[in-house]
Amino acid sequence: MRRSAVSPPWGATLADRQSPIRGLRWVAAATLVASAAVAHAQPAVIFELGGKFDRSFNQAAYQGAERWKKETGKPYLEFEVQNAAQREQAARRFAERGASPVVGIGFPQASSIEAVARDFPNQRFAIIDMVVALPNVQSFVFREHEGSFLVGMMAALASKSGKVGFVGGMDIPLVRKFLCGYEQGAKHANPKVQVIASMTGTTPAAWTDPARGAELTKAQMAQGVDVVFAAAGTTGLGIMQAAKDAGKLSIGVDSNQNHLHPGSVLTSMVKRTDLAVYEAFKGVKPGITALGLKEGGLDVAMDEHNAKLVSPAMLKVVEAAKADIISGKLKVVDYTVANACR
């Protein structure tokens, strides 16, 4: 039995055309060029459950691929996973077609990227939110606790009840990492604030259950929560809708989700999976690439949709904390390193 090159999670979420090969449905982001040489030069991206238009994690990755396409004028290949079995099938089929790099979006794809990268050592691969320790793989990981700290501060400063909420997707170390950073930030801004947290579930289905997200949000609001952080993939759409319906505030994640409910979304903790995909498409650099506030891999979203919700005083405090985290003056505990939030 070979030794796995996949490290534990640092973090970790449509329609395509029918193919006779293994029943998979394939979509090319642009018309495929007949020349084999050109086809072999094409990069490929495999989106995780929820699809490239999930308005969250996958969609940010899609935007990175589209940015590369627009800048280079070149096409890329894509596939949207519908079930677990398709992850390795998609990666292997792309590799067989000569695609390079093949980029897996999300930690659930790590084992498939590892297996296929071993079998195609002369091609390049990339994985987001996991470490695959192979010489032809670039692993992108994020310091999500840093960005979560900032939105935690904003939640505490915006709260009138002194109670802020967190609804996570799948209960895994990655989501606990978000929660831990959020709680630290909230208590940094207001030591007396109460943080009420819920997890949607323990299986990947927790990322795509807006109805359950809405239920958990309503339960928190019944306890007095008036700001809730939705760190739950597509499930977050239900969380944010429930907050809006109750006249409360929500915080988006991964993509800038402020526009989904203008005047109700306090901010979004933007995680630049778009940057990771864009950089991988430009050229894989094997090894680990860590992205945080300093590298521009994370940030809070400010735009016309939430400008009236964030006072100049609040923004000033948050920007000061951001600068202190970047300089190292302010340390934020990483749950996945400490295995605790303390």
Descriptions of predicted regions:
Residues 40-342:
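A residue-level marker of the well-folded mature domains of exported/periplasmic proteins
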Residues 9-10, 29-33, 94, 279:
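Enrichment for repetitive, rod-forming helical segments
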Residues 34-38:
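N-terminal signal peptide c-region/cleavage motif recognized by signal peptidases
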Residues 4-30:
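Bacterial N-terminal signal peptides that target proteins for export
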